[in-house]
Amino acid sequence: MLVLTRKQSEAIQIGEDIEIEVIAIEGEQVKLGIRAPKSVDIYRKEIYVDITNQNNEAAIIDKNLLQFLKNNNS
């Protein structure tokens, strides 16, 4: 993991298309601004984990439903 120190209004560049800027520092919170192409999905980590878990659960349900339908058509 790369660890960087940035002050307010400073930024980091990821590749050619993504820039992350420190907008504000308020107590224990840091506000970040992210400039990226619209084709890049950006989520808070906890939201991304929830989406991934829900997709995995849906895939299991779909697989079970498909197996059920196959067994009942035979």
From Swiss-Prot:
InterPro entries in UniProt: CsrA, CsrA_sf
Highest taxon listed in the record's lineage: Bacteria
UniProt GO MF annotations: mRNA 5'-UTR binding
Keywords linked to the UniProt accession: Bacterial flagellum biogenesis, Cytoplasm, Repressor, RNA-binding, Translation regulation
GO biological process: bacterial-type flagellum organization; mRNA catabolic process; negative regulation of translational initiation; regulation of bacterial-type flagellum assembly; regulation of carbohydrate metabolic process
Keyword Cytoplasm: yes
Annotated signal peptide: none
Subcellular location: Cytoplasm
Record's GO cellular component terms: cytosol
Listed Pfam families: CsrA (PF02599)
Subunit organization: Homodimer; the beta-strands of each monomer intercalate to form a hydrophobic core, while the alpha-helices form wings that extend away from the core.
Family: Belongs to the CsrA/RsmA family.
Protein purpose: A translational regulator that binds mRNA to regulate translation initiation and/or mRNA stability. Usually binds in the 5'-UTR at or near the Shine-Dalgarno sequence preventing ribosome-binding, thus repressing translation. Its main target seems to be the major flagellin gene, while its function is anatagonized by FliW.
Xref: NCBIfam families: csrA, PRK01712.1
Protein name: Translational regulator CsrA
Organism taxonomic ancestry: Bacteria, Bacillati, Bacillota, Bacilli, Bacillales
